[in-house]
Curated annotation (Swiss-Prot):
Molecular function terms, GO-annotated: GTP binding; ribosome binding
Binding residues annotated for GTP 1, in chain numbering: 7-14, 54-58, 117-120
Gene3D superfamilies referenced in this protein's UniProt entry, alphabetically: 3.30.300.20, P-loop containing nucleotide triphosphate hydrolases
The entry's keywords: GTP-binding, Nucleotide-binding, Repeat, Ribosome biogenesis
Domain EngA-type G: 1-165, 227-400
One GO term (biological process): ribosome biogenesis
Cystines in this chain: none
Protein's UniProt name: GTPase Der
Length: 490
């Protein structure tokens, strides 16, 4: 079931949206027009998921150049949803915009709840009778900012959706012993086998205990959920246009003015029976270019989108040089260890330029580009758009492939035979054991004799060896080390 939240500007729609979804997804600000696109979230309750759509404030008398598109987005959300919430400001009484919206929504013959928001005091509640004139029988007074009567609204939504309240089941009296955490068990892998350390051994009791812990550690099953893909880039490079072109509909408001997108907009899409969630982000600006609190929050949300996405699509403008902001975004993607693809948009404007030469030159401009997958596309002409899906799938498949422990150890053993570590103070680095610890982020854990014997050049050699062996040129990864604990003297 889908619920659309509609209303004129600044009545608290985004605050209500955040309260229902129990997380701050929409930017909340007293400035009118903060929300422009449709923003999607979820209510997770009663063992069910209800999708919620936040829309921009509708005001046909506004001179805002985006208002026509905001109006179209709101009406599209109303058509898409099965339940409608018309939000009004109880303190203002009925306005002309409220009346116009009610007249638009009532003929849709869908369940319609009038949410009289900002009912912060008992005095506000005394104005409920004023709203009978809108002709909406289902009315609930709320205060989203103070979390008042949100439970009543949720209960009404549950009733309309005909979701049964889950029965309380008796808890099993027998509780299973808690297994060791994956991190704790992983750290013991190198010590579970007596043969790992030459001339050193564990007691039989210690070895049996550690082997049991290691046996209980299983590779977690892959998460069965849509793949999250964030489009990142500085303002006005065409991120929203790319999403609209992929979906073949105007899901995101576009304009030549930088900063059109403010919220992070999650857009679900299915391609070849595979589910994706594209996250359209606000463009990252230079700090001195951020003029107000809304733009600051938009830039902050962009970084949060990078942190929560599975893969990043960095969008750059083919007609412009790689900018400081592009390089800043690349370093941010690298810091979060996110697999990524670079989309060079507006290729339709590049005349007389050979694509392979452009790509070669682009790789030389920043070390973080390296061997990243680069696609030259045109959202305007829909050129090479389908290649985006194959690029996403190829890179993400490599980034989430769990490597076998035996194969990782064979690769490292061969590397050490080809190129021995240097001797430091009469000792040489030894790698006893290695595992592929995690895929997100992609991390190897190496058990060694001493951190002091690992030099930076040799670490780079090991990293390049693993990169070549497992085709990790397009996947950022880390090496972690765990040194053998010092033996206790009797």
């Amino acid at each position: 079931m889908r619920i659309a939240i509609l209303g004129r500007p600044n009545v608290g729609k985004s605050s209500l949206f955040n309260r229902l979804c129990k997380r701050s997804l929409a930017i909340v600000n007293s400035q009118e027009g903060t929300t422009r696109d449709r923003l999607y979230g979820e209510i997770r309750a009663w063992d069910s998921i209800i999708h919620v759509i936040d829309t921009g404030g509708v005001d046909q008398e506004s001179t805002d150049r985006f208002q026509k598109q905001i109006h179209q987005q709101a009406l599209a959300a109303a058509e898409e949803a099965s339940v409608l919430l018309l939000v009004v400001d109880i303190r203002c009484g009925i306005t002309k915009q409220d009346e116009e919206l009610a007249k638009r929504l009532l003929p849709l013959k869908k369940p319609l709840i009038l949410v009289m928001n900002k009912a912060d005091s008992q005095q506000d509640l005394q104005r409920i009778h004023e709203f009978y004139g809108l002709g909406i029988s289902d009315m609930i007074a709320t205060s989203a900012s103070h979390d008042k009567h949100i439970d009543l609204l949720l209960e009404r939504i549950r009733q309309i959706a005909q979701i049964p309240v889950p029965s309380v089941e008796e808890q099993d009296a027998v509780q299973e012993d808690e297994l060791p955490s994956e991190e704790a068990a992983i750290s013991l892998h190198a010590f579970a086998d007596e043969t790992l350390f030459e001339n050193e051994s564990l007691s039989q009791e210690e070895a049996s205990f550690l082997e049991e812990l290691v046996a209980q550690t299983a590779t977690p099953a892959p998460v069965d959920r849509p793949l999250k893909v964030a489009l990142i880039g500085h303002p006005n490079v065409g991120k929203s246009s790319i999403i609209n072109a992929l979906l073949k509909e105007e899901r995101c408001i576009t304009d030549n003015s930088p900063g059109t997108t403010r919220d992070n907009i999650d857009v679900a899409y299915t391609h070849n029976n595979k589910e994706y969630v594209f996250i359209d982000t606000a463009g990252l600006r230079k700090t001195k270019s951020i003029k107000n609190s809304v733009e600051w929050m938009s830039s902050s949300r962009t970084e949060k989108a990078i942190s929560r996405t599975d893969i990043c699509l960095l969008v750059i403008d083919a007609t412009q040089q790689l900018s400081y902001q592009d390089k800043r975004i690349l370093s941010m993607i690298a810091r979060y260890k996110k697999p990524h693809v670079i989309l060079v948009n507006k290729w339709d404007l590049m005349f007389g330029v050979r694509m392979e030469h452009y790509v070669q030159d682009l790789r030389k401009m920043d070390p973080y580009i390296g061997q990243a997958r680069i696609l030259c596309i045109s959202a305007k002409q829909r050129r090479n758009l389908l290649q985006i899906f194959s690029a996403i799938d190829d890179v993400y498949t490599i980034a989430t492939t769990k490597l076998s422990t035996s194969l990782v150890n064979k690769v490292l053993a061969s590397a050490m035979q080809r190129h021995h570590p240097q001797v430091i103070n009469g000792k040489r680095l030894r790698i006893y054991y290695a595992i592929h610890k995690t895929t997100t982020p992609f991390t190897f854990l190496l058990f060694i004799n001493s951190n002091s014997l690992l030099t930076k050049p040799y670490e780079l050699y090991l990293k390049n060896t693993l990169k070549a062996a497992f085709n990790l040129y397009r996947v950022p990864f880390d090496l972690e080390y765990k040194a053998k604990p010092a033996r206790k003297s009797n």
